[in-house]
Amino acid sequence: MPAPTFDELAQLPPPTLRQLIRRGDYAGHTSGLGQRHLQANLVILQKSWADEFLRFCALNPRACPLLDVSEPGSPHFARLGADIDVRSDLPRYRVHRRGQEPVEVNDIGAFWEADFVAFAIGCSFSFEQALRDAGIGLRHLELGRNVAMYRSSIATRPSGRLAGPTVVSMRPMKAADAIRAIQVTSRFPLTHGAPLHLGDPTLIGIRDLARPDYGDPVPLAADEIPLFWACGVTPQAVLAEAQPELYISHAPGHMLVSDRLYDEL
């Protein structure tokens, strides 16, 4: 049987999509998948870091809107779906060890530890369908790419050992669409809400839009302006500075697709 096309994947209900991912039949980005369902960034930390990270999320709700937290040792997010297993249900993960480059894998069962605490953080992929419903085109989806993400000069509010830059995702739009996008996304605070910035990227420390720190470059037309949303990759930038001995995250753009609708929580 041939592998499903991306358009076919986009029509699948989340449990079916997760089954494909769990079997290793899909390992690509999730922008455009799940239709109107919440997507989540993932952070998995040893319990000794969990309280600090929980407070970090509370202090930085635009970048880290918390959707669910697992019990220590549990790989499940009961609030987001009955059969979710965070060890296998994301297309791609990053395993981070102190002093080493992250390793990307498609399953983290072999790395799981009894004191791990998993955090699900809202993702802007969740409101992309609402933008499309409003007639707003999304260039990265039109090109079949991941969204472009950048480390900005906007500082997060620190929590203990955790401090660092806010990562932002960028979507180019014409001015009229930008106004409508602000109106639409402001309704969804659990998926980063309205943009943090629009216009000149140098004002938030971004020198070259053609060279994103994460994801894929997305071209900007002459009559468009860039809009920047807070991004759930922010914890990866912050944890890279804090240097826990071990933590696991999603690979940027490769999210957990939940059973919850984006306007349900």
UniProtKB/Swiss-Prot annotation:
User: Which positions form S-S bridges?
Assistant: none
At the top level of its lineage, which domain of life is listed?
Bacteria
> Where in this chain does the entry annotate a coiled-coil region?
none
The answer to whether UniProt assigns keyword Ribosomal protein to this entry is no
Q: Name one GO molecular function term.
A: lyase activity
Per UniProt, which keywords does this protein have?
Answer: Lyase
UniProt family annotation: Belongs to the D-glutamate cyclase family.
- What protein name does the entry list? Putative hydro-lyase PSPA7_3193
Q: Which organism is it from?
A: Pseudomonas paraeruginosa (strain DSM 24068 / PA7)
